[in-house]
């Protein structure tokens, strides 16, 4: 009799424990939140940190398209990693690495860089193109750049870069204040295909821009940048500092 009672008690306790483990509302293993620093899914990391500026599918955003094989062909992993980890000085691109004040670990930075290349790069896209180099240590000449601009760019952006029927102004103070010289160079070389802007080969049919043309146009654009960008405020009624 005692044995039977013991068996029944044990069975009842087991049933109770099983019921508790599957009670409605009890969190499952899949419900456990992931610590942000442990997220290693490219889609999640890109969506949370990159899509806002570069577009949800790598194009169509305010910043340069990452889903551009031409851009990825001239910008190597060192360039991508440095930009992602440390940001780009003189632009709106922030630093994302924890070592630079951001929120992402080194591993997460690597996931983003590798994911961008695996998803959007095409290894042979510039096989026979001989593009201008991503960066240049030789400064361009603004005077020559004005002539090169007129030849290669004015048909879309208008005389003096102030905007035309096909494209807007590229000498706008706010625009130039958001881009450093390297970003200007990158755009001149790879264009903005997501916005209809051609790369260095497509401005004049059959006549690609030379490396010197690229450097000179960048120098001319940079020379249009205001030293202290911003709205000019009226001085009417402004205090002279005199005590009255």
Where in this protein do the model-derived segments appear?
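Bacterial N-terminal signal peptides that target proteins for export
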Residues: 1-10
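C-terminal motif of bacterial Sec signal peptides marking the signal peptidase cleavage site
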Residues: 16-19
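Flexible coil segments in periplasmic/lumen-exposed cytochrome c-class electron-transfer proteins
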Residues: 24-32, 36, 40, 44-47, ...
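Gly/Gly-Pro-rich "capping" loops immediately C-terminal to redox-active cysteine motifs
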Residues: 32, 36-39, 43, 55, ...
């Amino acid at each position: 009799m005692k044995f039977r009672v013991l068996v029944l008690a044990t069975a009842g306790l087991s049933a109770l424990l099983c019921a508790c483990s599957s009670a409605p509302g009890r969190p499952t293993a899949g419900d456990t939140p992931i610590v942000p620093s442990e997220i290693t899914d490219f889609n999640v990391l890109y969506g949370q940190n990159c899509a806002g500026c570069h577009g949800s599918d790598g194009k169509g955003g305010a910043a340069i398209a990452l889903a551009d094989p031409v851009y990825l062909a001239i910008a190597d992993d060192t360039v991508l990693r440095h930009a992602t980890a440390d940001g780009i000085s003189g632009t709106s691109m922030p630093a994302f690495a924890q070592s630079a004040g951001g929120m992402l670990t080194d591993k997460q930075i690597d996931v983003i860089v590798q994911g961008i290349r695996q998803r959007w790069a095409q290894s042979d896209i510039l096989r026979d193109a001989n593009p201008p180099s991503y960066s240049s240590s030789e400064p361009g000449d603004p005077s020559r750049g004005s002539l090169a601009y007129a030849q290669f760019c004015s048909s879309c952006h208008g005389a003096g870069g102030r905007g035309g029927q096909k494209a807007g102004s590229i000498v706008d103070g706010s625009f130039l204040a958001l881009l450093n010289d390297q970003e200007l160079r990158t755009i001149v070389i790879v264009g903005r295909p997501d916005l209809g802007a051609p790369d260095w080969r497509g401005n004049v049919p059959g006549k690609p821009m030379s490396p010197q043309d690229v450097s000179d146009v960048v120098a001319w654009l940079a020379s249009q940048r205001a030293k202290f960008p911003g709205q000019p405020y009226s001085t009417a009624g402004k205090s002279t500092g005199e005590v009255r």
